[in-house]
Amino acid sequence: MSDPTTDDVRRYIADGLACEHLAVEGDGRHFFATIVSPAFEGQPRVRRHQQVYAALGDRMREQIHALSMKTLTPAEWAAESQRSQHHHH
């Protein structure tokens, strides 16, 4: 079985989790996902990650160690987007 592409990983996550924003970057060996989902509201980071792993199911079992992620609620994402827009030095 060939390694998943960033598009594959993105699709896997989107299939199992309602995301408001989902971006996956990677080089085929390592993946970094930014996942914004209302499902994360009130959840600690560990639970958020568990939800993402559950969404992936067996599809990423081999590569799961290669996936790092940032899990945000829509409110956290909005706050972060606003902050990054105000970085004028």
Locate the predicted segments by residue.
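N-proximal, solvent-exposed amphipathic alpha-helical segments enriched in charged/polar residues
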Residues: 1-20
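A short interface-forming secondary-structure element
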Residues: 34-47
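C-terminal structural segments of small proteins and small subunits
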Residues: 55-89
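Residue-level signature for short turns and capping positions that connect secondary-structure elements
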Residues: 29, 38-40, 74
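Solvent-exposed beta-strand sheet faces enriched in polar/charged residues
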Residues: 25, 36, 70-72
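Short edge beta-strands and adjacent turn/loop segments
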Residues: 16-32
